[in-house]
Amino acid sequence: MKKMVKDARHEEEFEISSAATSDEVIGYDIYPPAKECLRKHDIPFQKRGARQVTDEDYSYYDHIFVMDWANLRDMKRRFGDEKGKIQMLMSLAGEEREIPDPWYTGDFESTYRDICTSLNKFLSESF
């Protein structure tokens, strides 16, 4: 998303972050096959340690996108979502479905395409 926003010259209008809903990956860097997919599509990234979503994230960010029903349920249970900030990423593209987790499927390309489809729709409606 950062690259899409930068390419559209709207960097000043967005602050983008990523966080896990569980604590099982906290501190881990980007999964190596995910890095390969990012490189293939010229998406810049840097070494980082995963972090868990915080109460401050819900207060601070205008939109919180999740990729599967379990994360949607967990996030809404945690935050209540009175402001309607939390939504399934594919719903942005008009599809009420999960984005398959490439950790389990091994299909990082399909996941990349789904994410791009959804974010392109979101960004086209935001500008």
Task: List PLM regions with ranges.
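Conserved active-site segments centered on acidic
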Residues: 1-60, 124-127
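Phosphate-binding/catalytic loops
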Residues: 63, 69-127
